[in-house]
């Protein structure tokens, strides 16, 4: 807990003075005040995070964390667990959707194995921080120990701290793990208080019969483990996943370093919910990249008071939505840096 506690102690609110200056600059640009809508709000929030009315967005990374899940033993999933490590290898060598979208926005990919079940060969492009070969089947007991849950969070903090040392203005979260919509639905239901019917989606394409099995399995896991909704680490340890804990650590670590976090879809959202329950202040550092088609994603975003930048009917994960949203965030910041003011352009201002 030492690293986690030290990280939490470094998190404080937005720089209001920088935000006022950023908004004042927006108000003198050659446009009606407020006419760029959410683009203006984005850059003002960025200013508050970085403490600079002209924030930076050049140095970007997407951290994609992977873990397997014991609940796939319940036989309602369409894909074998081996796919997790196979996709990790694709991430590491540039062939996946997240690689394409990261290249497009100029973000580096950071690929982390945190709880992968299938043995894998050493790869210089994969950071192997495996805590265990996947979670235990939460239908029969806790997914992991409390100590392992804390370790997952602290690995996430360590990973983002290392990226900050390389230079980091924006960090996106991404995930990979067969079966990880189940723990995400469990986390969402427990913390928001919404029913499993409300928050559970089809994941990678579950049939109606698979959906019944999925909801029943998650309900059994929650009933058996009885997690404390107010104790995020208890929730994570009993019904979570290693990659979810790691991404929660990325979010907390980024906030401690005054780095904006672009949160991807449902699994990243579950990680954000864990981080938010530990430290509500982290909301100030998060941008919700998009609203996934997973129904629980909208619910957890509403719980945290976050508005999604995009709505693209996506449900892939990996950090793909985060990479896309970085384009919007960078565009907002370019307006702040490059657009002319009324005085610069010789344009008459609105008459009072």
From Swiss-Prot:
Catalytic activity, as annotated = 5,6-dimethylbenzimidazole + nicotinate beta-D-ribonucleotide = alpha-ribazole 5'-phosphate + nicotinate + H(+)
Q: What's an example of a GO molecular-function annotation for this chain?
A: nicotinate-nucleotide-dimethylbenzimidazole phosphoribosyltransferase activity
GO BP annotations, alphabetical order: cobalamin biosynthetic process
EC category name: transferase
Q: Which SUPFAM superfamilies match?
A: Nicotinate mononucleotide:5,6-dimethylbenzimidazole phosphoribosyltransferase (CobT)
Do you know which InterPro entries this protein is assigned to? Answer: Nict_dMeBzImd_PRibTrfase, Nict_dMeBzImd_PRibTrfase_bact, Nict_dMeBzImd_PRibTrfase_N, Nict_dMeBzImd_PRibTrfase_sf
Keywords in UniProt for this one?
Cobalamin biosynthesis, Glycosyltransferase, Transferase
Q: List the disulfide bonds.
A: none
Catalytic site: 318 (proton acceptor)
| Protein EC | 2.4.2.21
Q: Which pathway or pathways does this protein act in?
A: Nucleoside biosynthesis; alpha-ribazole biosynthesis; alpha-ribazole from 5,6-dimethylbenzimidazole: step 1/2
| HAMAP family in UniProt | CobT
Q: What does this protein do?
A: Catalyzes the synthesis of alpha-ribazole-5'-phosphate from nicotinate mononucleotide (NAMN) and 5,6-dimethylbenzimidazole (DMB).
- Family membership noted in the UniProt record: Belongs to the CobT family.
Q: Which PANTHER family match?
A: NICOTINATE-NUCLEOTIDE--DIMETHYLBENZIMIDAZOLE PHOSPHORIBOSYLTRANSFERASE
Q: What is this protein called?
A: Nicotinate-nucleotide--dimethylbenzimidazole phosphoribosyltransferase
Which species is this UniProt entry from?
Dehalococcoides mccartyi (strain CBDB1)
**Which gene holds the coding sequence for this protein?**
cobT
């Amino acid at each position: 807990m030492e690293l986690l506690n030290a990280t939490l102690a470094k998190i404080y609110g937005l720089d209001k003075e920088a935000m006022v200056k950023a908004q004042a600059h927006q108000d003198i640009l050659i446009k009606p005040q407020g006419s760029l809508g959410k683009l203006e709000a984005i850059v003002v929030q960025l200013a508050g995070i970085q403490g600079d009315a002209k924030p930076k967005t050049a140095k970007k990374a997407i951290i994609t964390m992977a873990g397997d899940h014991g609940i796939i033993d319940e036989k309602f999933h369409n894909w074998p667990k081996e796919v997790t490590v196979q996709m990790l290898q694709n991430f590491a060598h540039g062939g996946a959707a997240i690689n394409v979208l990261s290249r497009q926005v100029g973000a580096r990919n950071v690929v982390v194995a945190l709880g992968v079940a299938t043995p894998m060969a050493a790869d210089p492009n994969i950071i192997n921080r495996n805590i265990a070969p996947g979670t235990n089947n939460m239908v029969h007991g806790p997914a992991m120990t409390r100590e392992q849950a804390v370790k997952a969070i602290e690995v996430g903090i360590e990973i983002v701290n290392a990226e900050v040392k390389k230079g980091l203005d924006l960090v996106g979260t991404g995930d990979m793990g067969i079966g990880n919509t189940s723990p995400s639905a469990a986390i969402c239901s427990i913390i928001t208080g919404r029913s499993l019917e409300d928050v559970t989606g089809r994941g990678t394409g579950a049939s109606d019969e698979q959906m019944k099995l999925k909801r029943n399995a998650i309900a059994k896991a929650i009933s058996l483990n009885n997690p404390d909704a107010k104790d995020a680490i208890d929730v994570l340890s009993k019904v979570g996943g290693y990659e979810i804990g790691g991404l929660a650590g990325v979010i907390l670590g980024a906030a401690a370093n005054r780095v904006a976090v672009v949160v991807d879809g449902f699994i990243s959202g579950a990680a954000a919910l864990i981080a938010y329950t530990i430290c509500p202040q982290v909301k100030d550092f998060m941008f919700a990249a998009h609203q996934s088609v997973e129904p629980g994603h909208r619910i957890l975003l509403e719980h945290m008071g976050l508005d999604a930048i995009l709505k693209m009917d996506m449900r892939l994960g990996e950090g793909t939505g985060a990479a896309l949203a970085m384009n919007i965030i960078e565009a907002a910041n370019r307006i702040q840096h490059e657009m002319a003011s009324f005085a610069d352009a010789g344009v008459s201002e609105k008459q009072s």
